């Protein structure tokens, strides 16, 4: 298949990408971002120049659409992963209109979406920077909505806030934070979340095209590729990896390199060899594996069964098969970690105990390893 975005663009894409590990210097931005906050750094530069930034946002019903504006207030909605198929209806036309009127534009989307934008625009624009990300696969909005309905039924309250990859329990826990109207808070980790485990474990939630993705590898269609830098602990020091999220940045074109130079004052970065990034980011070059369950049966059941029954039939969570040794280990780990985090500060020690054992609004489980720590 022809993966070139269009004829006549010239050689604007380099086959060899320059790779960097990076984090935003603003700790609040980094904490609120999916990884290290690099998309925010890029977006902030565009806003500063009076330009427009486009990407995926949650709608009120937690469906996802592509959106663009020149208002920095929208950055909080644009940053962070959504993990869902987004509706890009009308988005490409609006981008073209802005570009033709001379506006500076930075857009972000999946590799297939950004390749489609390249093809739609026909030519490259000097006032356009395209960002994509290393994509494992996009998930079904229908599955996600059923998951949210299940949570609302379980907690008897409407969801008023949802954030994937919340970092209160650490970047590597892949925690979804869910806040309900009745003030209850759920921290759903990679070991407890039916949505995360279904996505990463069964691989049945994604689009059929994701199992044979035509936009893996090189050349990249975007000027810049961003991602979680999984495996950062093996290549960078604690200055860039303290479990708060580290970004991998791939500079795929001269335009991408030049734009990256303009944000260096707002980030901490280190150039890393290309070979070092593949171990934790196989999705850069490899399509999603085929589902581990019958996909046809799964979606037929999705139309007729409650989500909790779907989960019981198709999804096996690690916490559902905890041994007594694992439970004991989790309890001991909790006691050790709160002592370390509290730094032998007795009031803070009891604060951690209270949050995890006696706070009704916070749903944690010590024996299951789902914990919440507060620091001084």
Predicted regions: what they are:
Residues 2-13, 373-376:
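Single conserved hydrophobic/aromatic residue that forms the stacking wall/gate
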Residues 7, 112, 210-213:
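Short cysteine clusters
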Residues 11-38, 43-45, 371:
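Electropositive, gly/pro-rich neighborhoods at or near active sites that engage anionic ligands
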Residues 33-37, 60, 107-117, 137-139:
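Gly/Ser/Thr-rich loops at beta-strand to alpha-helix junctions
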Residues 51-52, 157-372:
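Long, compositionally biased charged/polar accessory segments in the mid-to-C-terminal portions
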Residues 66-90:
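Glycine-rich phosphate-binding "P-loop"
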Residues 123-133:
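A short alpha->loop->secondary-structure connector
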Residues 131-147:
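Short, flexible loop segments at boundaries between secondary-structure elements
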């Amino acid at each position: 298949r022809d993966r070139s975005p269009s004829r006549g663009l010239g050689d604007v894409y380099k086959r060899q990408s320059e790779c960097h590990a990076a984090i935003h210097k603003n700790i609040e931005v980094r904490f609120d971002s999916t990884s290290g906050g690099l998309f925010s750094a890029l977006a902030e530069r565009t806003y500063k120049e009076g330009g427009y930034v486009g990407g995926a946002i949650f709608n009120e019903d937690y469906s996802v659409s592509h959106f663009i504006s020149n208002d920095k207030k929208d950055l909080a909605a644009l940053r962070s992963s959504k993990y869902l198929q987004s509706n890009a209806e009308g988005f490409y036309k609006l981008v073209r209109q802005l570009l033709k009127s001379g506006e500076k534009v930075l857009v972000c989307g999946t590799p297939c979406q950004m390749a489609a934008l390249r093809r739609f625009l026909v030519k490259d624009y000097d006032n356009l920077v395209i960002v994509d990300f290393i994509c494992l696969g996009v998930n079904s909005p229908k599955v996600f909505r059923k998951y949210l309905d299940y949570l609302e039924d379980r907690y008897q309250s409407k969801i008023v806030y949802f954030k994937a990859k919340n970092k209160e329990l650490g970047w590597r826990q892949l925690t979804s934070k869910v806040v309900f109207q009745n003030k209850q808070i759920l921290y759903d980790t990679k070991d407890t979340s039916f949505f995360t485990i279904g996505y990463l474990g069964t691989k049945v939630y994604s689009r059929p095209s994701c199992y044979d993705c035509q936009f893996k590898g090189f050349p990249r269609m975007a000027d810049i590729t961003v991602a979680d830098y999984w495996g950062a602990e093996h290549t960078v020091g604690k200055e860039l990896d303290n479990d708060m999220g580290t970004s991998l940045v791939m500079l795929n074109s001269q335009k991408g390199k030049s734009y990256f130079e303009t944000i260096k004052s707002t980030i901490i970065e280190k150039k890393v060899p290309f070979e070092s990034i593949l171990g934790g980011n196989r999705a850069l070059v490899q399509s999603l594996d085929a589902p581990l369950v019958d996909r046809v049966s799964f979606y037929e059941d999705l139309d007729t069964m409650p989500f909790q029954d779907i989960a019981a039939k198709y999804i096996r969570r690690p916490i559902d098969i905890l041994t007594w040794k694992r439970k004991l280990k989790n309890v001991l780990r909790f006691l050790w970690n709160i002592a370390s985090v509290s730094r032998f500060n007795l009031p803070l020690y009891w604060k951690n105990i209270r949050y995890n054992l006696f706070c009704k609004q916070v749903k944690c489980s010590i024996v299951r390893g789902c914990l919440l720590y507060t620091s001084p």
